[in-house]
Each structure stands twice: as C-alpha cells, then as structure tokens.
C-alpha cells in the first residue's frame, strides 16, 4: 500500500519531535586501543593486526593511555564531569566484524558524564545536554561482494578487513533533545557541526565524516503535543552534515505518515540513502539487556588522578565558540563568513596569513577562493595544497603594489602551488608583472583606438560604457598584463571623454 507523505510544515503543528544523537569518533592515536598495532588508514587487508585485536586465545589487552587522555580532554571541552573511577565492559554480540564475539566498551561507569554543548540555530542559542562520553574499540570493516552498491542485500559473499578492529573510538551520546519543533533538523546539524569543530580544535581526530572517522547515528521520535514521548528509531551511520539534517527531516515525515494512518512506530535501526533522502528499515533495535554487558575481567579499572585532570583542563585550547567570537570582533566578520572559514578548516591558515601582512579580507579571499577550489578538485587538505600563509601574503602584497592584477595573481598562484618558487620569483621568471611603462601602454591604447574608430567615436560622443571594448583590445595586446583601470583612464583621456 502506498502512503502519501505529509509536507514537512504539516508535521510539526500536529507532532512534537524529540531527537538524540550518538557520534563515534576515531581517535588519532598512533596505536590501537588495547594493543600496539598501528592505526594508519589504509594498508593491505588484515596486515595491521595481532593476536589481541584478532581476539586469539591467551591474548590480553592493555588500555592505551593516550586514548584515555584524549577522551578526558573531549569530556572537559564538553563541560562533563570526569569520573573518579571507571571501568570497561564486554558488549556481547555475534557478528563477523568483531572476532572475539564481544566488543570492549564502557557501560554503567563511563569516563565522562553529564555535560553540554551550546550551539546556535538561526541566531538562537540552544544547549544540548551530553549524557556520556565513553571509550570503546572499533570493529572491523565488512565488504559485501555481489550485492547492490556494497550492501549485504543480494551479496554472494562477505569479506572482513580487521585493520580497523581495535582502533580507539569515543562515543558521545546526547541527552534527549525535546522542544526544538520545526528546527529539529537544523539543531541536529548544528550540534554535529559544533562538535566536529570542538574535536578538530582539540586535535584528537581528523573528524572526516566522508572517511568514517566521525560517524553519526540519529534518534528520532514524534508524539502529539503534550503527550508521552513516542517510540524512537535510530538512523545509522549518517555520513555528512547535510545528511544529518535530511535524515531527521525524512524520518519525521515518515513517522508522521505512519501515525496519521493509525499505525505504530517500531523501535528499529534504519538506513539513510543519500541519493533519495529516504530511510529504510534495517533491523529491530536491541536493548542493553540484549548485549549482556558485564565487567571486562582482563582490564583494571581506570582512576584518573585529579591533578592530571586539572592539568589537562588548564591546557585546553581556545574552543571554537570563543575563537569565533574573538575573530569576528577582530576581523569584522559576519556569522556566515566565520562559518565558511571553519567549514574549510582555514582558521589557522588565515590567521597566519594576516600575521604575515595581509588584510583579513585578502586572506579570506585567497584561502576560501582559489585555494579552496583547488583543494576540492584535488581532494587535498587545504593546509597541504602547496601554498604557505607567507606566500599568500606576499602574493597579495604584489597586487597591492600594482605589480600584479588579480588575474595575473591567480596565474602566479598556480605556479606557487606547483612548487616553482615564491610569488616574486615566479612573476619575474615568467614575465608576468603588470605593464607599467606609460609609453608602451599609450601605444597600445592608440593602436586600439585606431583599429576601432566606430567605438572610439561613441566614447567621444559621451557613451563611455563603450570604452570597455577598447579596454579589452588593449588587454589582449598586452596579454592581460595591463591594469584595466589604468587602461580605461588612459583611453578616456586620449578621447577627451569624461568617465
């Protein structure tokens, strides 16, 4: 039976959404959570493994201190209380991606609890409660062969790569978020965006959603206004900020259509499809009882020294909200401008470019324009694109000095990125400097006027807009190395016209 889906703006007046988010963050440690295997991305399948992460009999885990420290720093940045005593637990389930048939996680005694993260949505502050931040190990990666787009449906066989098994993973769980109404999808996206920025500022993870180092599960439920919260569903592994927003919106619409038809919502996991924006049923949702948690007998409890925790708190960097506020005041930026910089990961690059002598506007122009475009085209990180903040500041200095036009500067920048030298060296070696010889420019202008008498007459007659064609002719003659403004002024002067 085909169900007609309601429009989104019809959902919220009749139902109140409650959302919650669970994010898994791969920590950027050198070794895995409970063994010494490297955590580098890639490598031939099943080559970065050992008896511990393969769960072989007789192997014993040892907790990674660097992962514990990173988790405490995350908890402090999220305003959590750090437990005086916590322990690991076994989460029991049978699936090929975890060869031990259990995952080492934390259950009733996590490392960090009861925090919050403040976000802004449409200029309105929203405080998101944090239930817990705990440590666990990642699973292996399953590849389904023969099915559609790598899914298990229709697959003829499944392969498992255990290189990822045992990588330190932090799970950050929000408290239920009611009362957001129609803004629920935007609130979800704002939370994940802010969390990503916090994690990036801490340097604990590269937080690349597209590579799986930041994975998000979205819980959604609806209830009629004033009534008990509804049954929630969990949309798994949403892998982009845009998809977080779309997944909440899609699930709200779907649940409303089920409730409108007199049906009931089943507690289950669902899969979000990027291409359609829809969710489809996965499996019934397990409860904690299904996993039969019990304390991990092979690991001692962790009792962070209060002095150590205090030192970590004192060493926290300036967090994104405070950083944005300071930069906006110093640079005169709008919220949108600041978010663009953060999304591009360009804050430090722009700050360094300004420190090297460029204006905030010029620094933003290059890093968010030409260099971001090139990074997107090549898939490189902006910081690894091949241009340094000092070179960008030097390039802008040549523009400000009238030695390069913006167009010529873009050409020079291409060669800078290619590693050919500094902007000044490239400008000289490739003869790209703006033509400043007045005699040569005047000759080029006179040539353009002589070659285009009809246009010249229009300009003499007061139609100065027609001078653009003459400017173009001069720019062609000088191979784009003349300053267009100077050329236009010279044309009007030669034709006795007023601009």
UniProtKB/Swiss-Prot annotation:
Keyword Translocase belongs to the record: no
Keywords noted in UniProt: ATP-binding, Ligase, Nucleotide-binding, Protein biosynthesis
Q: Which reaction does it catalyse?
A: L-glutamyl-tRNA(Gln) + L-glutamine + ATP + H2O = L-glutaminyl-tRNA(Gln) + L-glutamate + ADP + phosphate + H(+); L-aspartyl-tRNA(Asn) + L-glutamine + ATP + H2O = L-asparaginyl-tRNA(Asn) + L-glutamate + ADP + phosphate + 2 H(+)
Query: Which cysteine residues pair off into disulfide bonds?
Result: none
Listed EC numbers: 6.3.5.-
- Is Protein biosynthesis one of the keywords? yes
Q: What class of enzyme is it?
A: ligase
Family annotation (Pfam families): GatB_N (PF02934), GatB_Yqey (PF02637)
The terms under GO molecular function for this entry are: asparaginyl-tRNA synthase (glutamine-hydrolyzing) activity; ATP binding; glutaminyl-tRNA synthase (glutamine-hydrolyzing) activity
Q: Name one GO biological process term.
A: glutaminyl-tRNAGln biosynthesis via transamidation
Report the domain of life of the source organism. Answer: Bacteria
Its job? Allows the formation of correctly charged Asn-tRNA(Asn) or Gln-tRNA(Gln) through the transamidation of misacylated Asp-tRNA(Asn) or Glu-tRNA(Gln) in organisms which lack either or both of asparaginyl-tRNA or glutaminyl-tRNA synthetases. The reaction takes place in the presence of glutamine and ATP through an activated phospho-Asp-tRNA(Asn) or phospho-Glu-tRNA(Gln).
Tell me the protein family, please: Belongs to the GatB/GatE family. GatB subfamily.
What is said about its interaction partners and assembly? Heterotrimer of A, B and C subunits.
Cite the NCBIfam families for this sequence: gatB, PRK05477.1-2, PRK05477.1-3, PRK05477.1-4
Write the protein's name. Answer: Aspartyl/glutamyl-tRNA(Asn/Gln) amidotransferase subunit B
Lineage runs: Bacteria, Bacillati, Actinomycetota, Actinomycetes, Micromonosporales
Gene that this polypeptide is encoded by: gatB
């Amino acid at each position: 039976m085909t169900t007609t889906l309601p429009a989104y703006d019809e959902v919220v007046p009749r139902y109140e959404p409650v959302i919650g988010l669970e994010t898994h963050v791969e920590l950027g440690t050198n070794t895995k959570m409970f063994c010494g295997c490297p955590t580098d991305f890639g490598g031939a399948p099943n080559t970065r493994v050992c008896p511990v992460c393969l769960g072989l009999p007789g192997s014993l885990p040892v907790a990674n201190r660097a992962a514990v420290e990173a988790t405490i720093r995350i908890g402090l940045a999220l305003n959590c209380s750090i437990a005086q005593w916590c322990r690991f637990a076994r989460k029991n389930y049978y699936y090929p991606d975890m060869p031990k048939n259990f995952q080492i996680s934390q259950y009733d005694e996590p490392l960090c609890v009861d925090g919050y993260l403040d976000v802004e949505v449409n200029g309105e502050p929203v405080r998101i409660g944090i239930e817990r931040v705990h440590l666990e190990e990642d699973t292996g990666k399953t590849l389904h062969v023969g099915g559609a787009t790598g899914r298990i449906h229709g697959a003829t066989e499944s392969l498992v790569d255990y290189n990822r098994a045992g990588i330190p993973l932090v799970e950050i769980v929000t408290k239920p978020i009611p009362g957001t109404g129609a803004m629920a999808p935007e609130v979800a996206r704002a939370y994940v965006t802010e969390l990503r920025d916090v994690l990036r500022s801490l340097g604990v993870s590269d937080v690349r959603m597209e590579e799986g180092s930041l994975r998000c599960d979205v819980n959604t439920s609806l209830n009629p206004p004033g009534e008990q919260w509804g049954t929630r569903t969990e949309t798994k592994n949403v892998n982009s900020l845009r998809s977080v927003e779309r997944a909440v919106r899609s699930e709200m619409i779907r649940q409303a259509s089920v409730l409108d038809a007199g049906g009931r919502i089943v507690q289950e996991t669902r899969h979000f499809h990027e291409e359609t924006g829809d969710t489809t049923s996965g499996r019934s949702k397990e409860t904690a009882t299904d996993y039969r948690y019990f304390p991990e007998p092979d690991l001692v409890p962790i009792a962070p020294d209060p002095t150590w925790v205090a030192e970590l708190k004192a060493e926290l960097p300036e967090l994104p909200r405070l950083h944005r506020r300071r930069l906006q005041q110093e640079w005169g930026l709008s919220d949108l401008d600041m978010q663009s910089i953060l999304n591009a990961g360009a804050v430090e690059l722009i700050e360094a470019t300004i420190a090297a002598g460029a204006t905030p506007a010029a620094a933003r122009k290059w890093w968010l324009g030409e260099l971001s475009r090139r990074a997107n085209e090549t898939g490189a990180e902006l910081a690894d694109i091949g241009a340094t903040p000092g070179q960008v500041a030097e390039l802008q200095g040549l523009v400000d000095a009238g030695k390069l036009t913006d167009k010529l500067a873009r050409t020079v920048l291409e060669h800078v990125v290619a590693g050919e030298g500094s902007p000044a060296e490239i400008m000289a070696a490739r003869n790209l400097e703006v033509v400043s010889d007045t005699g040569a420019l005047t000759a080029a202008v006179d040539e353009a006027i002589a070659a285009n008498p009809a246009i010249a007459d229009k300009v003499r007659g007061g139609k100065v807009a027609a001078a653009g064609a003459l400017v173009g002719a001069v720019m062609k003659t000088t191979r784009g190395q003349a300053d267009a403004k100077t050329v236009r002024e010279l044309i009007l002067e030669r034709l006795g016209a007023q601009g």
